[in-house]
Structure formats: structure tokens, C-alpha cells
UniProtKB/Swiss-Prot annotation:
GO terms for cellular component: cytoplasm. Keywords: Aminoacyl-tRNA synthetase, ATP-binding, Cytoplasm, Ligase, Nucleotide-binding, Protein biosynthesis. This is Histidine--tRNA ligase. The lineage of its organism: Bacteria, Pseudomonadati, Pseudomonadota, Gammaproteobacteria, Pseudomonadales. The keyword Ligase applies. It comes from Pseudomonas putida (strain W619). The keyword Iron-sulfur does not apply.
Amino acid sequence: MSKSLQAIRGMNDILPEQSPLWRYFEGTVAGLLDTYGYSQIRTPIVEFTELFKRSIGEVTDIVEKEMYTFEDRNGDSLTLRPEGTAACVRAVLEHGITGNGQVQKLWYIGQMFRHERPQKGRYRQFHQIGVEVFNLDGPDIDAELIMLTWRLWGLLGIQDAVKLELNSLGTSEARARYRDALVEFLSARLEQLDEDSQRRLKSNPLRILDSKDPNTQAVLVGAPKLEDYLDEDSRVHFEGLKARLDAAGIPFVINTKLVRGLDYYSKTVFEWVTDKLGAQGTVCAGGRYDGLVEQMGGKPTTGVGFAMGIERLILLLETLGKVPASINRQIDVYLCAFGEQAELAGLRLSESLRDRLPGLRLAVNAGGGSFKSQFKKADKSGALFALILGDDELAKQEIGLKPLRGQGEQQNIAWDALAEHLETAIAQA
């Protein structure tokens, strides 16, 4: 196949055999968010480039290296969204839905785009589910977001495989004081830092704390600590969050080097990490961004949120063997009909079954075929039962019901009793 007819590197198709797991995961998250009172918002995948420069920060890796940016026919610079928070903030500002202190608890799902080196668990087009809350500034809402994700891990059966890491970045003023102290310390040890950290020292020194270079990490052992520069309000907020997590029985560790890769965070930051996926260990991350709305032209409005990577969490479910067997069955019943009159009766019967059993997953054979070929297709479909309708059954207004996945003989069931019989048989299968 020529290159022009292949998917772009790092942008993957989700094939039919993969879709049930995606639907299961997305449905589980959406259902949980509904129970917590969150409303869905949908934003475009393309925004003006300036939005991300103002929100994420011009000297971040995302803006400098990773964004898909292009000029449209009007000469405007546009960018495929690399993350969801900025677009969500833009939307609530544009439509005025956080005015007068109105609380908004929102969630979204969709594709994000970053030009990174593709590897296991990291792609150029990837999917996120994110949550954003506006106009609530206490540690209680921070705790709710973390408790919500902890409950999700329980529903998915992966609580034992993830760990919560917490930190507080304080206010922008506190970070500025810390930044000055950190720059002074590291400038005196510049030659001991890796090349990337030397570059970041001038542009975004807090990101050096997250360096993976062992020599840089050795230097950081003696560096000033962010917690020593926190303002009192941030300290109280962080203690309040930890107290609530303790009360909820959610284990956590403090990671003083956790700073996140986006400039807009303040006070609480957190990550859920796993050691089951190799280097790509973060599956969910978030924090507070109390100054972002004002920074983007709105009135002072507090914000807090998180985003989770769907690809990584699905990979984690597969790695741990936590994929429910039931989701791989697409069809409950496969109807085989032999002869034109049986086919016509089968169509009427199948639609009657759909009326009476709205959740029934029923496939009707298409394209005709012999008994052997139709039965082979029924078995291959993964259905629990085959319905068999021929001239003999048609004359008696009956239909054959044959188990495909377990023990049991074929039974002939009267048409008017079929719906009730099927419902019971599927429930017991």
C-alpha cells in the first residue's frame, strides 16, 4: 500500500474488535460523572493558536515543539488542540456561563494532538476524558475530583495498580519567590545540568525538577524546596486536602518534584501513576488553575480539573487482565431463515422482538445461504443462541432455539412465547 493511503504515524485506527472495550471504558466514566452531577461540554478540535500560547505558556515544550499549527486561507494561525482545559475555559468565557460566581462542573471527551515521538502509550493523536470545575475554591472540590477518580479505579478493578502523587505549587507570587531561589542555586551548578535543563533554566526552571537525567537529579538533592516558599493560604488549602483524603481512606504520597508541564497550575497538583506500563506511567493528572480565567481575559474565577488518557488506561486494563469478558460479545441472538417465506416471517419476527426486548442484540442473517453456511456465520458471530426458521417451523408458527455457547438441545418455541423465553435464557447464559 502506498504511504498516502496509510494512517499518519502516531494516529491510529480503532478497529471493530477494539471498540467494545473503548465503549465500556467511556460508558463507565460517563455514568460515574453523571452520578456526581457533572455536565458534558463539547468544544472544537481546532482553536486559534494564541489561545494555547496564552494559557499553556509560550516557553513550554507543548507550545515550542509539539503543537500541530497551520495557517488557514484567511491567514489565521490555527492549532489542533493539544489539551482540553484551554478550550473549555475559552468556551465558558465566550458564553458567559461562569458569570456572577456561577458554579460549573463540566466534563469532556475527545481527541488531542501533539507531535511527539510515538511509543507504547504515547501517540500523536490521543484521546482524553477531562473534568473542569469553576467557581469553587476550597480543598473539598479538589478532594472530590480525586475521590471520583479513586472510585473509577475501583469500578475498573485497577486500584491496586495506581498510586496518587500530590504536591502544592502555591500561588504565583510564592512560585516567583521559589523560582528566583532555584535559579540562583542551579546557576551556580550550571555545568552539572543536562543540556535540556540548562535551556529550561532561562525559560521554565520549575520544569527542571521533573528532569529524568540522573546527574541533574543528583544536583537537585540539595536544591531549595518549594514547600519552604509556600504562602499560608496554600499551606492551609493543602492540609485541608490531605485531611479529606485521609478521611476518605485514599492513600497518597507527597512528591515535591511534581510540577506538571503546563504553566497555568497553582496550589494543588496531582497525578495518578502506575508502574505497569513502563516509562509512560501517568494515567491521570490535574490540579488547580485559579488564575487562568483572568489571564485569558475573564473576571477572577477559580478553576480545578484533571484529564485522563484513554489509550493508557485501556492498555492498563489489558495488561492487568481487567477486560470484562461480556463486552466482547456483540450479539445475543442470530436468526437463520431458510426460504423466501421464512425470510419474510423472520423479518417480522425480529422487529417484534426488538419492540418487546429493546436491549436485545439481534442479528438477522443476510445474503441467504445453506443451513450449514448460515449456522457457521451464527457461530462465528459470537451469539449465545441461534434462532432457526424454516418451512416446518413456519407452518407451526414456531422457531428453533439452539444454544451456541453451552450445553443444551434445540427447542421449538411458539412465536408468541419467544420474547419471554429469550429474555430468561439470555439472563441465565
